[in-house]
Swiss-Prot record:
InterPro entries: Aldolase_TIM, ThiamineP_synth_sf, ThiamineP_synth_TenI, TMP_synthase. HAMAP family: TMP_synthase (MF_00097). Binds 1 Mg(2+) ion per subunit. It comes from Vibrio parahaemolyticus serotype O3:K6 (strain RIMD 2210633). Pathway: Cofactor biosynthesis; thiamine diphosphate biosynthesis; thiamine phosphate from 4-amino-2-methyl-5-diphosphomethylpyrimidine and 4-methyl-5-(2-phosphoethyl)-thiazole: step 1/1. The keyword Thylakoid does not apply. Its EC number is 2.5.1.3. GO terms for molecular function: magnesium ion binding; thiamine-phosphate diphosphorylase activity. The keyword Cell cycle does not apply. It catalyses: 2-[(2R,5Z)-2-carboxy-4-methylthiazol-5(2H)-ylidene]ethyl phosphate + 4-amino-2-methyl-5-(diphosphooxymethyl)pyrimidine + 2 H(+) = thiamine phosphate + CO2 + diphosphate; 2-(2-carboxy-4-methylthiazol-5-yl)ethyl phosphate + 4-amino-2-methyl-5-(diphosphooxymethyl)pyrimidine + 2 H(+) = thiamine phosphate + CO2 + diphosphate; 4-methyl-5-(2-phosphooxyethyl)-thiazole + 4-amino-2-methyl-5-(diphosphooxymethyl)pyrimidine + H(+) = thiamine phosphate + diphosphate. Keywords: Magnesium, Metal-binding, Thiamine biosynthesis, Transferase. This is Thiamine-phosphate synthase. Condenses 4-methyl-5-(beta-hydroxyethyl)thiazole monophosphate (THZ-P) and 2-methyl-4-amino-5-hydroxymethyl pyrimidine pyrophosphate (HMP-PP) to form thiamine monophosphate (TMP).
Amino acid sequence: MNAYRLYLVTDDQQDLPTLKHVVRKAVEGGVTMVQVREKHGDVREFIERAQAVKTILEGTGVPLIINDRVDVALAVDADGVHLGQSDMPAEIARQLIGPNKILGLSIETEDQLAEADSLPIDYIGLSAIFATPTKTNTKKHWGIGGLKMALNTTSLPIVAIGGINETNIPALSATGVHGLALVSAICHAENPTKAAEYLLSLMD
């Protein structure tokens, strides 16, 4: 199974009951990976939210990824970590989490892309494909053309992130990209189960 296919990134603006509801329903709809992202809260709150999501995911086969914080990933024994370019270097993160955890890295420029294959990572998050309200400090927008170029450049699986929604999923899927990461299209949906099912149907 391709675990990257429909990659849910949680919304750190949602309270804990909403977060749990979204994750539970999204997994019922076919989400294949969940990344808990916390940019504003304290570490204790991050651990609490990550632990709550881990409990929901137990027995589902859906991996739990922690955004940025290796310490939080270790604290809850998550399945992996996703690093940004300003986070801990990938080599150090790999030493800390060991050889069997999933390690992802955000790639924002062509120079970073060129180096990716030499790093001890499992996948890259290509950011941002399109403009997005959830991330305003992006270095560039790759677009479909940039995504195709990236797929030809690296041997690593690519998860596309940034501005992905029902209107552009068919074109993105046609590139052969390994996965699509979404926040708003699932977290803000009235029914996250139906949203996930619908988004998956657009990938076929």
